[in-house]
Amino acid sequence: MILLIIEVREVSREEKLRTIISTIDNSEYSNNKDNNIQHNCKMKTFKDPQETWLSSTFSKMKYADYKPFQFVDGEGVRCSIYLSGCLFACKECFNESIQNFNAGSPYTMELEDKIIEDLGNSYVQGLTLLGGEPFLNTQVAIQLVERVRKEFGDKKDIWVYSGYTYEQLLKSSEDKKKLLSLCDVLVDGPFMIFLK
């Protein structure tokens, strides 16, 4: 008789994502010149996040939607803004229609004033930035978040949903680092339907 002992341990979300991300075939975005090979990867990746995907290059300073008084984009009642444009192109993305940087409407001071007014309600816990990719729209995101901090200090929390990982953002451009430093919660990493 053989006794098999299996150690069971909890795996953190970060460990799961690292394992999953390391098994994704990203070769179609590498220097592979063989176009006859079929690839399953739908997520675009990059070698140097600081020098390739810059907000100043891609952002059109547009937003796709603003939804006040939401319950699904973080804890408590939230005001959520969906910024236009994303280069990750995650497979089965919920917001595929706003991956285009030209989607939606120009961000205006009138919209910003409305967001600040809505956040002023005592029952609203905070602001959520989604997309698209907020870190590819830092001109808009930083302006809005700095205004929220000026008006409310730390009384309203700020959440950001991003296809970037925390580690990538730490090595990224200065504008991305600044936005990261202004936020309270980062929900990071590419969207993967099987983790839902």
Question: Can you describe what each PLM-predicted range is?
Answer:
Residues 53-64, 77, 95-160, 164-176:
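Conserved Radical SAM active-site core
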Residues 2-8, 17-22, 41-82, 95-101:
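N-terminal [4Fe-4S]-dependent radical SAM core
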Residues 72, 167, 195:
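Flexible, glycine-rich phosphate/dinucleotide-binding loops
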Residues 78-93, 133:
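Cysteine-centered iron-sulfur cluster-binding motifs in ferredoxin-type domains/subunits
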Residues 183-196:
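Classical nucleotidyltransferase
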Residues 29, 38-39:
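Low-complexity, intrinsically disordered or signal/transmembrane-proximal segments
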Residues 7-15, 25-28, 34:
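Acidic, Ala/Val/Gly-enriched low-complexity intrinsically disordered segments
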